[in-house]
Design a protein with these regions (language model features):
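Short amphipathic alpha-helical segment that frequently serves as the phosphate-/nucleotide-binding helix
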Residues: 1-3, 92, 147
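Conserved catalytic-core segment of NTP-binding enzymes
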Residues: 94-99, 103-191, 198
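C-terminal lobe/tail of nucleotide-utilizing enzymes
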Residues: 155, 159-251
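Short, hinge-like loop/turn segments at secondary-structure boundaries
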Residues: 32-37, 152-153, 205-208
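Helical mechanochemical/support elements of P-loop NTPase systems and associated helical scaffolds
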Residues: 8, 91-94, 141-145, 211-218
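A conserved segment at the C-terminal end of the G1
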Residues: 1-18
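Serine-centered coil/turn micro-motif
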Residues: 41-44, 119, 139, 213, ...
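P-loop/Walker-type NTP enzyme "switch/lid" segment
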Residues: 17-101, 196-201
């Protein structure tokens, strides 16, 4: 959510956060506080995908999360029941194709794949992403888990994938030490700010100067490096540098 709300938008452009975690989404009951029940979201694309209508149905499932109703920062809510993931087998590939070409509609997309979505059937979304991000705490427990997940990601995605780390502070290990140990770039370091984070995860009341707080400032700063990574990859592949597709590989 922090990236969605801070991503820089050119005139006429929009950004989508797609919750594609096979273990279920968190935005509807969390940030949106259950205000939309389960009327929109990923589950509704299963039937559309089987009928060859996913390209049209996708846009109807997006939810505006801006206060002004500008519809330039949108969410595709995830599954409310993980059991529904089994019906999405053919949908992942169709979504990947849609996201790959989404720039023609002046949209960028951030894909949240949760803890295990970057492997298995939904991994095609990570394979097609410009940048894959793994979120981890800078504690020993967090980094041990990250090391195992990074190895699995690299096996799944191959050597050409751009994999970066997002660190959540709270442990003793520094950025440089983590980069050396895990052999991955730390793209962003987010401060441990539970009160500010609760606004994004649970729809809590915003504290004073939330937009200028440490958490949102750190998220905003990270977008600069992310856009550089996207441009570098696209230059290497001979693609336009604007916009991008990002996937979160783990949380």
């Amino acid at each position: 959510m922090a990236l969605l709300l801070t991503w820089p938008l050119e005139a006429g452009h929009k950004i989508v956060l797609a919750e594609c975690d096979p273990d279920g989404g968190a935005i509807l009951p969390g940030a949106l506080q259950g205000t939309m029940a389960n009327s929109h979201g990923l589950r509704n694309l299963a039937l559309a995908g089987r009928q060859g209508q996913l390209g049209e149905a996708f846009w109807r499932q997006l939810v505006d999360v801006t206060d002004a109703g500008s519809r330039d920062r949108l969410v595709l809510p995830g599954l409310y029941d993980p059991a529904h993931a089994s019906s999405l087998g053919p949908v992942w590939e169709q979504l990947a194709n849609l996201f790959t070409g989404i720039e023609q509609y002046q949209h960028d997309v951030i894909v949240d794949l949760g803890r295990r979505g970057a492997v298995g059937p939904s991994s095609v979304l990570a394979q097609r992403a410009d940048v894959v991000l793994m979120v981890t705490r800078n504690s020993l427990r967090g980094l041990q888990s990250a090391q195992v997940r990074l190895a699995a990601l690299r096996d799944q995605l191959g050597g050409a994938a751009q994999i970066g780390l997002v660190l959540v502070e709270g442990g003793p290990f520094g950025r440089d030490e983590i980069q050396r140990t895990l052999q991955a770039e730390v793209v962003a370091v987010l401060p441990w700010q539970p009160e500010q984070a609760a606004v994004l995860s649970d729809g809590a009341e915003q504290p004073r100067r939330f937009e200028q707080g440490e958490l949102m400032r750190a998220a905003r700063t990270s977008t600069t490096r992310l856009r550089q990574m996207i441009a570098t990859r696209r230059s290497r592949l001979g693609q336009p540098a604007a916009g991008g597709r990002e996937a979160s590989g783990a949380r």
